[in-house]
């Protein structure tokens, strides 16, 4: 399963671990993803999304119906 937020599109980025001796080793910074069920009142059903915590805040602000409309406009199956 891809580590990508369905709402924001956040995905892993690469960087370095830096030791005290300034040695750099490659690492990945992963987004803070959660599988979360949202109740959609207009459809009378739950929708399960894999979203970041930033995505949860966006849903709190805009509302689940607006966010689902944007996802469907992008062609994502929800």
From Swiss-Prot:
InterPro entries in the record: Ribosomal_bL28, Ribosomal_bL28/bL31-like_sf, Ribosomal_bL28_bact-type, Ribosomal_bL28_sf
One Gene Ontology CC term in the entry: cytosolic large ribosomal subunit
Name of one Pfam family that matches: Ribosomal_L28
Stretches the record annotates as Disordered: 1-22
Annotated keywords: Ribonucleoprotein, Ribosomal protein
Listed GO biological process terms: translation
Gene Ontology MF terms: structural constituent of ribosome
Protein family per UniProt: Belongs to the bacterial ribosomal protein bL28 family.
The protein, known as: Large ribosomal subunit protein bL28
Species, as recorded: Saccharophagus degradans (strain 2-40 / ATCC 43961 / DSM 17024)
Lineage, uppermost ranks: Bacteria, Pseudomonadati, Pseudomonadota, Gammaproteobacteria, Cellvibrionales
């Amino acid at each position: 399963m891809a580590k990508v937020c369905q709402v924001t599109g956040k995905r892993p980025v690469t960087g370095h671990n830096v030791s005290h001796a300034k040695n750099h080793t490659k690492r990945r910074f992963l987004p803070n993803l959660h599988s979360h069920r949202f109740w959609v009142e207009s459809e009378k059903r739950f929708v399960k999304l894999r979203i970041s915590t930033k995505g949860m805040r966006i849903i709190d602000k805009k509302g689940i119906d607006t966010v689902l409309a944007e996802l469907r406009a992008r062609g994502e199956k929800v």
